[in-house]
Amino acid sequence: MSMMSFMMRMACKKNDAKRDAGLVYPDNVVRVENISYGPHKMNVLDVYRPQTTEAKLPVIVSVHGGGWVYGDKELYSYYCADLAKRGFAVVNFTYRLSPENKFPCHLEDTTLVFDWVKKNADKFGMDTEHVFAVGDSAGGHILALYCSLCTNPEFAANFDFKPVENLLPKAIALNCAVLDIDTIDGGMSSSSMKLMNDVLPKNKKKEYLPLVNPIAHVNEKFPPCFIMTCNEDFLKEQPETFKKKLEDFGVPYKYEFYGDEENLLGHVFHLDMKNEVGRLCNDEECDYFKSFLV
């Protein structure tokens, strides 16, 4: 493991513990925990539903962030429970991390989760006609690649696993996400790109680097997007070229920039259940998804 990945894990763990300190799990959300969705030890997920209904609900699949080297479903439990309160069945999963596992493991595990959703929809009251997804930071990167796996046959041909048939998300939310590797501040010397040294197979870096750039694989079939960033996000410039690419292909999107001089908001602020603007952002994303419930 590189020093960059080690420092990433230590810093994120400390920040996440501070973020969630004192939070109490809501008593109006039911959670089914630690369901296996694949062959690997880390292939586990939780399902969240509002306690007030047993009806089939629209689905949100949450793809966690963490620079491809950190994170799991436990760190997103309060966030996903909060989404469920808005009337969704929420799927929160852990995927294999780098550097112990190499790309495309993150993408393969995400594909397995969507396959699990399709196969277990009736058991867990999930409406597969209305599946949505959210991803933040590296999770947004993985989610964008998954959507291209579903919509771009040329991109999909690079992998020996296939997307779930007829389960492209109706819309997605890309939150403080890595969307255009070529425009990351600092380029190849940036922290994000240094992490790629731990993510990509050593003998396939040259082959895989173009594959891991989400903007390169967008086409007219890419799903509608809610794209957000904020004033203190180190990836706040990422949406600019991505929005232009969506416009070129006629893909609908909604863009929101949060924060101002009196309200400084950092990377993935929406995960903080104590942050009023973060909760507003989550409200607006869920309202965006609900606009597709027709």
Cite the ranges covered by each PLM segment.
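Alpha/beta-hydrolase superfamily serine-hydrolase fold, recognizing
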Residues: M1-V294
